[in-house]
Amino acid sequence: MSTQPTKTSSTKLRIFKWLFIISTLVAIAIPITRLLMHLYGKIDEKMYARIFMSYRVNSADSFMINGRYKAIKAKAYPTSEERNKFNSIAQEGDKAVLLKYPYPEHFSLEPEWHYTLCDDVFYNLWKIRVNVCEYYKNNKQEDIAGLVTPPKEAKVDRFFRQDPKISDDDYKKLFTGTDENGKGWSSAAVQFIDILLNLINKPEECKLKDGKLNEKFQKDLESLVSQLGYSTEDMKNIANEIPNFFIQFGKAFPTVIHSTVYSRFYYFFLFLTINGNFDFSEVEKTDGMKIEEFNKQTMKVMASVFAQIFAKVYEESYNYEIKDAGFMDKVRAYFSVSDNIDNVKDQTKNINTVKEVLIKNKELLSK
């Protein structure tokens, strides 16, 4: 009796097994290679802005906008002084900031461990957040054509929106009475506005080159962070970390602390520009679209506006690309981080509006 069919079947099975093993190894090797390239590979600094914008628009910005806090059972995790303090502010009593005010909250870690990234400086920003939400609550949003009106029982009239009609007095009230000992976000508002205006008007004086920031820009950032309330001892470490903050974002590989700091400044940027009349025409309204969804989309637009201002710190603009790339350049590009900017919409018009709004608001907050 012939055994040829059995041999053929056995050979096919071995070939299939080897193909499966090889394809599995390749599937594992590619992401590992990309991670190693990400960690240790050299990325052209001229590509930082492009990589940064790709990272923000295609993934990172959504985490700042879609995050919502849910109460954590007090006995579910070991207690500590830091966790107890966080819980008392975030979720306990009538003034539970993260529960009573459904404003977006960015979680670089799981919500259960969010407290490890919070300190008194971050808690101070929440005071402005409360003022903003209370303002929304007392000043209902007008209907937007084609959108569903929010329910009357809503605790807050939708978690975010621009309000060009806010009075100067109401705008100032968002920031007053939130700082202690002359330190905090409100006290640092004018400094932050100056930094944003410098990035918009004089980006050549704010550049990151060869791993270092322009000396004056570095000092301006140190002064801003100090004004937020960090101690002299803290500032020694923070000052050294500031250039790395921008470098890691240029590589799309920030630490959880970097990401948390970025989102705090983004929220602060939103609060400071709440009275701007921005262009949200890129947000497509659909039948039955709820107001909260529309506002979420406008928040994404503002995230892109903020990111494009932030990206001015880098040597080249975000639409820079390496011309006449050689074979090895293409290999490095394949295994490196994404630089796909197809979803990035130019925000020059809105950045010009930011400039006008901040000049006005600087004067208001300086009085």
From Swiss-Prot:
Signal peptide per UniProt: 1-29
GO biological process: cell adhesion
This protein's GO CC annotations: cytoplasm; polar tube; spore wall
Superkingdom in the source lineage: Eukaryota
Location of this chain's protein in the cell: Cytoplasm; Spore wall; Spore polar tube
Keywords carried by this UniProt record: Cell adhesion, Cytoplasm, Signal
Task performed by this protein: Involved in adherence of spores to the host cell surface and in infection efficiency.
SUBUNIT field: Interacts with SWP7.
Name by which UniProt lists this protein: Spore wall protein 9
